[in-house]
């Protein structure tokens, strides 16, 4: 059995007060992000660091990021290729243990991670709690999956996998992609969304602290059209996991379709793009509850999530009343 992650009861004054205390301590904290590589990275001019601001308060600087250079990309690829064989040969129990330790670290630092999520990506407390918990659950889920495989099951790693994650769930989806690739014996180069590199740096540092070798998981913050394009076109990338727009997914699809793996197989692309989600309401539903659920689903996180409500289907007998209440 896999234990569920711990959370916060925001209706309880005591944990809420503790969270507010942490938030006040970190209110003016400036986080930093830069390439995190298996080899020593190139020296970055701090004067070129890019400010990351709070999307809910643009005047508030949350941190700074030094985006990866072309040289950083090459160093990361070289380090990953060198680490491929040893990580693939690492026992699955040890790979799973690394993920579980990383989950424990995230859970222990949930308050700090929540505050950073609120400041860097505009999360509410409730959404920040849910995001950290989802990241923890992803790590433990994939660890448990590999542990429960039959002893004679063969899991053949691809090699080095590129993980490109979105800004709307910059810790949960970021961690889920990486966890799935790592536990299967792959090395990972993670390219976070350019808007949210700070939380990504924290996650990679926790994975390192949990025992994942530096060359096995690396971080390359930067733009999709530069860092992402250079990585996706490189023959050393043997798989891509992407969450984002359909437009970019199609570009990646065309890119990987131009080449094959060393053994002649297509390069896997796992792409999660936008959703078209419907809520179907029958005539027995409580109209007041439907309105609350529809508004929350459509507009929570400003509607910027793949699971957000797009289409509301209602029974003709109740449509007029429901639409009036929605308005």
Predicted ranges, named:
Residues 1-78, 82-85, 89-108, 115-116, ...:
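Terminal low-complexity tails and localization/encapsulation signals of metabolic enzymes
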Residues 151, 218-241:
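A structured beta-alpha segment of the ubiquitous adenosine-cofactor-binding alpha/beta core
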Residues 54-56, 65-69, 115-121, 129-132, ...:
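Active-site proximal loops enriched in glycine and acidic residues that flank catalytic Cys/His/Asp
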Residues 161, 185, 217, 237-240, ...:
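Structural signal for hydrophobic
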Residues 148-214, 288:
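Conserved small-residue-rich beta-alpha loop and adjacent elements
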Residues 209-211, 233-234, 239, 246-327:
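ALDH superfamily catalytic-core signature
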Residues 76-86, 101-105, 109-112, 116-120, ...:
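Generic, well-ordered alpha-helical scaffold segments in large soluble proteins
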Residues 161, 168, 224-230, 246-249:
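Beta-loop-alpha module in the N-terminal Rossmann-like domain of NAD(P)-dependent dehydrogenases
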């Amino acid at each position: 059995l896999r234990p569920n992650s711990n959370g916060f009861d925001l209706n309880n004054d005591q944990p809420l007060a503790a969270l507010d205390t942490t938030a006040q301590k970190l209110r003016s904290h400036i986080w930093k992000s830069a390439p995190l590589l298996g080899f020593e990275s190139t020296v970055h001019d701090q004067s070129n660091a890019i400010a990351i601001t709070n999307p809910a308060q643009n005047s508030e600087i949350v941190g700074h990021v030094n985006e990866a250079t072309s040289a950083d990309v090459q160093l990361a690829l070289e380090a990953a290729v060198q680490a491929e064989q040893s990580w693939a040969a690492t026992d699955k129990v040890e790979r799973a243990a690394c993920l579980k330790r990383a989950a424990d670290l995230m859970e222990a630092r949930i308050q700090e991670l929540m505050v950073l999520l609120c400041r860097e990506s505009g999360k509410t407390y409730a959404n920040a709690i849910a995001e950290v918990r989802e990241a923890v659950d992803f790590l433990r889920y994939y660890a448990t999956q590999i542990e429960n495989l039959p002893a004679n099951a063969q899991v053949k790693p691809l090699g080095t996998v590129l993980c490109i994650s979105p800004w709307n769930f910059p810790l949960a989806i970021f961690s889920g992609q990486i966890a799935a690739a790592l536990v299967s014996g792959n090395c990972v180069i993670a390219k976070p969304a350019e808007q949210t590199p700070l939380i990504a740096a924290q996650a990679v540092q926790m994975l390192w602290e949990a025992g994942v070798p530096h060359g096995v998981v690396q971080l390359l913050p930067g733009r999709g059209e530069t860092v992402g394009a250079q990585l996706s076109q490189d023959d050393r990338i043997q798989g891509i996991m992407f969450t984002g727009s359909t437009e970019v997914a199609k570009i990646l699809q065309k890119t990987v379709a131009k080449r094959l793996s060393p053994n002649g197989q297509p390069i896997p692309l796992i792409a999660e793009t936008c959703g078209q989600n419907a809520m179907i309401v029958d005539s027995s539903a409580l109209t007041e509850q439907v309105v609350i659920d529809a508004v929350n689903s459509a507009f929570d996180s400003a509607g910027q999530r793949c699971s957000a409500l797009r289409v509301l289907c209602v029974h003709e007998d109740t449509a007029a009343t429901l639409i009036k209440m929605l308005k």
